[in-house]
């Protein structure tokens, strides 16, 4: 929507129209949108300040009443004070924030579906007090969101609560605490029996997805979140669900009874949407239009959404090849990237040209830096990113360009498309954002309707989910299915519950394979019972089973699992894993892999540009493997393997002992101790942490708090740290 030309020379007529729309609940959103646009064109309405102020108040936009107008009358003051969540607070809520706050304050359970710009985090930070909620659990979908939320709550509530964001941190039930965890981390904790309030952010992720034929897509993360929901409902006094663009919720009432569902389209910024309807395959036309838009918005903060990190890299390379983005930026951060990664890396080259990349492959520290430099640098007005745009990235972008309607290989639905569009504009910064859709918008569908699987009839719930939720949350049909399964399965139920992300069929298959080795090849079975690092034979067997259980994970992250030229792919994968296991640090591993790849490229070709591009790809590929495979999927699988091995040893009285714990931790914590791994998640890169570790001696490396305190106290005096290292530390430690 834009201000209609017939109103341009009649501000009074425009305000009268807006007032009429605001008076009708059906059209109030349109009236509010008109009022926000007047704030973006204040000069036109300078003669109608009192009327405009009245309409801002009528629209429920009390924060703007507080910040955009100087002369407040009694009615203004009453409205402002009535919408402050706490006495003497500088925060002023808008109408929907106040409604949600009051519902929670009265002890009700609330499901809130509202736009991204609605200000949900302000509700959380203002509702929480130790007197009201002593133990709070906040479930967020990603580690990136853990850190974004941690930073906000440390500033707002750090003196009142202990903020627990990593499972290496213990909990004293007598101490007020806020847990910020992914669903997987919550499910691992055994110290949260009594909870006063739990919050699920992005609650729409509870729902299962289906392919075009109606077949369930197996989603281990949705399963984990439903398990968390079941456990939290049994342990918590009150709950609050937050997310965007959901119009109905099915299956929740049967679990919890009464709750308040607030579905609001209340926005604090307006958005203009322009559609180009370019066919997905017409890349030349899309690039042409993209250049036109970027030229039009060259002095404004603009986000371009792409389907994948590879697509983002290619688009950045295309823009760098033109005249609009010259390599004019060079500073000590570029030098740091060149030294610690490679000067040929596309992330580094893009920054030189004023282009910022942001995607899930990047280490946490660089993701933070990308957002920071985009928000504050006048030379970096373009951010090219992937679905990370809707996973905890808060920017000052005025414009969003949706370059393609895909997330990876899959088309995005209307829900996700709306979520991306919601990133345009920023309260107090840009009253009106702009969205450019290069392809046609997705058709209307039911993606805005959430069905909570464990509260539905349970017929579509995998057995590993049914076995891991509270029995009171099973429907009669689901309970019958679970009881029938228990009568015939060879898997101990505790193994299913401890490894709930794995389908029971895969757990059973792995148990059979390991037991077969015990029976047929006991010498190999003994080698599986290792301490420290596996032998070549043990690693090979483990890898065969890992491929069988997580083939899609490996192929998605660049591993070839099929034979080529009579070469055994398992040997190749084992070699790569062995190199990582043997490496002293992530930095050492990266250097080894890059040197190996560079030597192979030099042997096979002489084209420097091709070599440079491939070397850039090597860094991205390895970072993705480190994060997704070494750091998550493989240690997760080793935990399952270990549980089965322990079960067989106990059942068959083999007398064998083993300990996979050190290897699992070494993989999961990316060559760091538990405490340093938590610090790394906060945004300090491996390279900087290695310098710190050499200086901080006689300290408990498993304690996040002790390490944080020591780093904050001593990093200024550590000579080996340069200004870039100190930037990362300061940004992470606040």
Task: Go through each PLM region and give its residues.
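N-terminal helicase ATP-binding lobe
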Residues: 1-734
């Amino acid at each position: 929507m834009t201000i209609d030309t017939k109103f341009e020379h009649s501000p009074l007529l425009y305000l009268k129209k807006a007032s009429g729309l605001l008076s009708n609940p059906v059209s109030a959103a349109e009236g509010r949108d008109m009022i926000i646009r007047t704030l973006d064109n204040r000069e036109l309405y300078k003669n109608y300040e009192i009327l405009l102020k009245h309409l801002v108040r009528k629209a429920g936009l009390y924060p703007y009443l507080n910040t955009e107008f100087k002369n407040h009358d009694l009615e203004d003051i009453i409205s402002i004070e009535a919408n402050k969540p706490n006495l003497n607070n500088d925060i002023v809520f808008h109408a929907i924030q106040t409604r949600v706050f009051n519902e929670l304050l009265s002890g009700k359970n609330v499901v809130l579906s509202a736009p991204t710009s609605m200000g949900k985090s302000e509700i959380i930070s203002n509702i929480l007090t130790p007197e009201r909620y002593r133990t709070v659990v906040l479930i967020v979908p990603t580690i990136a969101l853990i850190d974004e939320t941690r930073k906000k709550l440390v500033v707002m509530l750090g003196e009142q609560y202990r903020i627990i964001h990593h499972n290496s941190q213990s909990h004293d039930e007598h101490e007020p605490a806020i847990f910020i965890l992914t669903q997987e981390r919550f499910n691992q904790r055994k110290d949260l029996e009594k909870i006063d309030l739990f919050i699920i952010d992005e609650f729409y992720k509870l729902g299962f997805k289906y392919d075009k034929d109606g077949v369930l897509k197996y989603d281990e993360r949705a399963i984990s979140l439903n398990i968390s929901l079941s456990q939290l409902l049994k342990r918590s006094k009150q709950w609050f669900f937050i997310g965007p663009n959901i119009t109905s919720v099915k299956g929740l009432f049967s679990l919890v009874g009464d709750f308040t569902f607030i579905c609001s389209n209340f926005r604090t910024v307006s958005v203009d949407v322009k559609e180009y309807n370019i066919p997905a395959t017409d890349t030349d036309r899309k690039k042409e239009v993209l250049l036109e838009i970027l030229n039009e918005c060259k002095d404004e903060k603009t986000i371009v959404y792409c389907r994948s990190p590879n697509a983002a890299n290619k688009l950045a390379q295309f823009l760098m090849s033109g005249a609009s983005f010259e390599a004019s930026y060079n500073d000590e951060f570029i030098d740091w990237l060149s030294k610690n990664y490679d000067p040929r890396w596309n992330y580094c080259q893009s920054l030189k040209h004023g282009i910022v990349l942001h995607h899930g492959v990047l280490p946490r520290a660089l993701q933070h830096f990308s957002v920071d430099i985009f928000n504050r640098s006048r030379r970096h007005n373009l951010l090219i990113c992937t679905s990370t745009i809707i996973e905890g990235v808060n920017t000052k972008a005025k414009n969003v360009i949706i370059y393609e309607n895909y997330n990876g290989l899959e088309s995005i639905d209307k829900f996700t498309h709306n979520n991306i569009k919601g990133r345009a504009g920023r309260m107090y910064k840009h009253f009106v954002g702009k969205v450019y859709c290069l392809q046609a918008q997705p058709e209307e569908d039911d993606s805005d309707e959430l069905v909570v699987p464990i509260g539905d009839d349970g017929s579509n719930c995998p057995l590993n989910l049914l076995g891991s939720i509270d029995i009171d949350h099973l429907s009669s049909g689901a309970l019958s299915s679970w009881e029938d399964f228990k009568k015939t399965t060879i898997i101990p139920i505790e193994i299913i519950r401890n490894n709930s992300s794995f389908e029971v069929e895969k757990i059973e298959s792995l148990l059979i394979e390991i037991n077969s080795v015990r029976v047929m090849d006991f010498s190999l079975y003994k080698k599986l019972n290792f301490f420290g690092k596996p032998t070549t034979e043990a690693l090979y067997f483990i890898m065969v089973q890992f491929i069988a259980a997580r083939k899609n994970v490996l192929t998605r992250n660049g591993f070839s699992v099929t034979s080529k030229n009579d070469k055994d792919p398992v040997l190749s994968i084992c070699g790569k894993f062995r190199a990582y296991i043997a490496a002293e640090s992530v930095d050492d591993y990266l250097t080894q892999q890059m040197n190996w790849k560079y030597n192979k490229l030099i042997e096979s070709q002489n084209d420097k540009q091709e070599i440079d591009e491939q070397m850039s790809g090597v860094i991205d590929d390895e970072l993705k493997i480190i994060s997704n495979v070494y750091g998550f999927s493989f240690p997760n699988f080793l935990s399952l393997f270990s549980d089965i091995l322990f079960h067989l040893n106990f059942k068959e009285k083999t007398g064998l002992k083993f300990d996979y714990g050190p290897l699992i931790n070494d993989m999961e914590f990316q060559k760091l101790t538990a405490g340093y791994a938590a610090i790394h998640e906060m945004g300090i890169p491996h390279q900087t942490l290695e310098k710190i570790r050499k200086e901080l001696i006689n300290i408990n490396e498993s304690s996040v708090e002790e390490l944080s305190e020591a780093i904050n106290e001593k990093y200024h005096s550590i000579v080996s740290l340069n200004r870039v290292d100190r930037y990362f530390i300061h940004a992470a430690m606040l």
